[in-house]
Amino acid sequence: MADVNKVVLAYSGGLDTSVILKWLQDTYNCEVVTFTADLGQGEEVEPARAKAQAMGVKEIYIDDLREEFVRDFVFPMFRANTVYEGEYLLGTSIARPLIAKRLIEIANETGADAISHGATGKGNDQVRFELGAYALKPGVKVIAPWREWDLLSREKLMDYAEKHAIPIERHGKKKSPYSMDANLLHISYEGGVLEDTWTEHEEDMWRWTVSPEKAPDTPQYLELTYRNGDIVALDGVEMTPATVLATLNRIGGEHGIGRLDIVENRYVGMKSRGCYETPGGTIMLRAHRAIESITLDREVAHLKDELMPKYASLIYTGYWWSPERLMLQQMIDASQVNVNGVVRLKLYKGNVIVTGRKSDDSLFDANIATFEEDGGAYNQADAAGFIKLNALRMRIAANKGRKLF
C-alpha cells in the first residue's frame, strides 16, 4: 500500500467504521486518529471513545458541532429557501461539508497525511466528503475502503469484526432494517422494503414524528422572529440556532410535520428512494418564505427563486466549498439585510399554515393594495399605458401577420 503514516478517520463507532479502523491499521500499518462529530443525531457519542481506545487509538476527537452546524451551514442554506428536486431539504448533504472541514483541521493539527471515511462507492457522500477535502487541502490523500476492499456485505463485515475481536452486537437489540442517517436537521431512511418503490413505508419506521392522523386535534400556534433572514427567537424567547432547530423538531414532530417519501436522482447516476423526517426544517422553510413575502423586492425574490435550484444542486452534489457556491451565498446573504420581523404559524395534523407576518421593513402598503377607497394612493388609469407598452411587441407581431402557432 502507499506510504501512509497517520490517517484521520470519520468514526461513528458503528460496525462499518469500526471495521474500517482495524482495516486501516492492518492494511496501511499506520496510526489512526478517530473523529466523531456530534451533529445532534440523538445518539450517545461517548461510546465511540471507549471503542476506539479498545482498538488502540491514541488520539480521539469527539466534537460537539451542533451550534456550528446550524449557524454556519443550515441557516445559510435556509436563507435561500433551498430544496433539491422540489422536495428534499438536504439534511444529509449539508452535514458533509462540516465533517470534511473538521477532518482536514484535525489532519493539520495531528500531522496526518490522509483522511478516511465510511461512505460507499454507490452513494453521494463519497463525493461530498472528498470534494470538500480537496478544496480545503489539495494534497491530502483520501482512503475510501469501500472502493478498495472485498467486504461487500454486512455478513462479511460481521465476520471480519469477529475474526479481529472488534466489539460488535451480532445479537441482542434488534437492528433497524433501514440504513439511517441523522443530525439536527433530519433523519433519513433507505434500503429494506423502501427499495421497492411501490411498497408503502411502515409506520413504525418513523422516529421523530407522529402520524398526522394521530397528531393532536387542537392546533398549536408559533411565532418566529427573524433577523437578517435567520430565526433568533421562538414565541418571543431568544434562542441559539441549534436550540431553535431542536425545539422546532420537537414541536413539529408532535404535530406530524415533515415526513417525506421521495425518489431522488443521485449525483453518481442512479435513482434512490429515501424517506425523511425534517419537522423543524419544514417549519423553517414555510416561515422564511412568509417573512420574505413582505420584505423582499419582487425582482429580488424572483431572482432568488431562479437561482435556488442551482444552489441546491451545488449542495447536494458536494460543492459547498466551491467558488460558485460561495459567490451565490454572498448574493443570498445580501438579500437578507431587510428580512426582519415575525411570522405566526398554525401547526395542525401535518400542516404548517401561515396565519400572519409583520415587519418594520415590510414593503406591503395596505393603502395601495386595498380593495376599498385608497384616497388617490394608486391611480388606476396608469394601468392602461402600462398594459399597452407591455403588449407592444405582441401587437406588432400580430399586425405583421405572425402566427402564434
Swiss-Prot record:
It catalyses: L-citrulline + L-aspartate + ATP = 2-(N(omega)-L-arginino)succinate + AMP + diphosphate + H(+). Pathway: Amino-acid biosynthesis; L-arginine biosynthesis; L-arginine from L-ornithine and carbamoyl phosphate: step 2/3. L-citrulline binds at Y88, S93, N124, R128, S179, S188, E264, Y276. InterPro entries: Arginosuc_syn_C, Arginosuc_syn_N, Arginosuc_synth, Arginosuc_synth_CS, Arginosuc_synth_type_1_subfam, AS_cat/multimer_dom_body, Rossmann-like_a/b/a_fold. GO terms for molecular function: argininosuccinate synthase activity; ATP binding. HAMAP family: Arg_succ_synth_type1. This is Argininosuccinate synthase. The gene is argG.
